[in-house]
Swiss-Prot record:
Function of the protein: Catalyzes the decarboxylative condensation of pimeloyl-[acyl-carrier protein] and L-alanine to produce 8-amino-7-oxononanoate (AON), [acyl-carrier protein], and carbon dioxide.
GO molecular function ontology, one term from the record: pyridoxal phosphate binding
Protein name in the entry: 8-amino-7-oxononanoate synthase
Assembly, per entry: Homodimer.
Family, per entry: Belongs to the class-II pyridoxal-phosphate-dependent aminotransferase family. BioF subfamily.
Top-level taxon of the source organism: Bacteria
Pfam family, one: Aminotran_1_2
Gene expressing this chain: bioF
GO BP annotations listed: biotin biosynthetic process
């Protein structure tokens, strides 16, 4: 009965062009990768120009980080061996947390930091630990799935507001009667690339005695002076801020952290099940992240951010011209100044066909469909990396232009 039930649902997904399939990267994360399909051998792989990773600064295959990771393994071995609260919390983890609190969260007075294996786990831990029965969570409807799941698992009341509609949020806050209020938002929205107006949200938090929980997965390392992230980008400073950042995107490695008032961090240690009941990340990764943060903050990091900004501007300019020349296609480039550049095409079939046409021309750009994005807004999620070149961007737009002419 179970298998029949699952197969029926799989067929339904297939009919709606919603079935997901994995590819196998045969080479390290980089703009040019050899890629095979699930079921193929490595010898059948093709080289593709990829616009799909979140390696925004191009650090995932950086020699300095490879060396730091190898050094960390020599110093600390292959794994942590236990959870943080048993025997898995090493000096490497502690040093990373101290650095993150000081470097990534100077906007939060007296902040402490707590490291996690993934951003998903960090958000689940955060919202389930803070969102008890005395709390209300106010969440943007386009928040990342991990924030959605954390809010649903929490015992708190949940109120969602339309994307960046702060007049709605203001009315919800004004009507709230619970003693604890948490406004929860992405800083950079992962499927649209736009920024939440964090300054306005903090103003509402201060006005209504609420706390602002920020998922800076796609801003950390990229935005703000020295890549310190979205808090620095907006120049915010308040003890009402609770920051989650990931370390597997711009930082090039893996893991995540929460930075907040010391009492918030202590409460997570005491009660966050997604922190307590899982093995700590390998300490070698924590060791290597120190090298990553130094790169991000230094001259090389700034040069990479500047190059990334130039790539974003070039892509937007070229795509705008292409869309203007082919209005009958109905393509729309989302309003985004970040490395996430969504090309919205509408139907699931259209997005899949466009991705397949690019694949045939040697480009890897993923089609994103519901439920990840709203129905009718299927898209290509183009992501740029500082490891890309201007020639890579030109090649992508040329391939899209070729496909546009064929569709016309």
């Amino acid at each position: 009965m179970l298998i029949e039930h699952l197969n029926r649902q799989l067929r339904e997904r297939e009919a709606q062009s919603l079935r997901r399939r994995r590819r196998i990267a045969e080479t390290p994360c980089a703009p040019h990768q050899r890629v095979s399909l699930d079921g193929q051998t490595a010898s059948e792989a093709r080289e593709l120009l990829a616009f799909c990773s979140n390696d925004y600064l191009g650090l995932a295959n950086h020699p300095a980080l490879i060396g730091a990771l190898a050094e960390g393994a020599r110093l600390w071995g292959a794994g942590a061996g236990a959870s943080h609260l048993i025997s898995g919390h090493t000096r490497a983890h502690a040093a990373l947390e101290d650095t993150l609190a000081e470097w990534a969260a100077p906007n939060i007075p007296g902040a402490k930091a707590l490291s996690f294996c993934t951003g998903y786990m960090a958000n689940l831990a955060l919202l389930t630990a803070l969102g008890d029965a005395e709390a209300t969570l106010f969440a943007d409807k386009l928040n990342h799935a991990s924030l959605v799941d954390g809010a649903l698992l929490a015992k708190a009341k949940l109120q969602r507001y339309a994307h960046r509609q702060f007049d709605v949020l203001e009315r919800q806050l004004a009507a709230c009667t619970t003693p604890i209020k948490l406004i929860v938002t992405d800083a950079v929205f992962s499927m649209d690339g736009d920024l939440a107006e964090l300054d306005q949200l903090l103003s509402l938090a201060e006005r209504f005695d609420a706390w602002l929980v920020i998922d800076d997965a796609h801003g950390f390392g990229v935005l703000g002076p020295k890549g310190r992230g979205s808090l620095a980008h907006f120049g915010l400073r308040s003890e009402r801020l609770i920051l989650m950042g990931t370390l597997g995107k711009a930082a090039g490695l893996g893991g995540a952290f929460v930075a907040a008032h010391p009492s918030v961090i202590d409460w997570l240690v005491q009660s966050a099940r997604a922190y307590i009941y899982t093995t700590a990340a390998p300490p070698a990764i924590a060791h290597a992240l120190s090298a990553s943060l130094a790169l991000i903050a230094g001259d090389e990091g700034e040069a990479r951010r500047q190059h990334l900004r130039e790539l974003i501007a070039a892509l937007r300019c070229q795509l705008a011209a292409l869309i203007a020349a082919q209005p009958q296609l109905g393509w729309r480039l989302a309003e985004s100044d970040t490395a996430i550049q969504p090309l919205i095409v509408g139907s699931n079939d259209s997005a899949l066909a466009l991705a397949a046409a690019l694949d045939a021309q040697g480009l890897w750009v993923p089609a994103i469909r519901p439920p990840t994005v709203p129905v009718g807004t299927a898209r290509l999620r183009i992501t740029l990396s500082a490891a890309h070149s201007q020639a890579d961007v030109t090649r992508l737009v040329a391939a899209l232009a070729t496909t546009a002419r064929e569709l016309a």
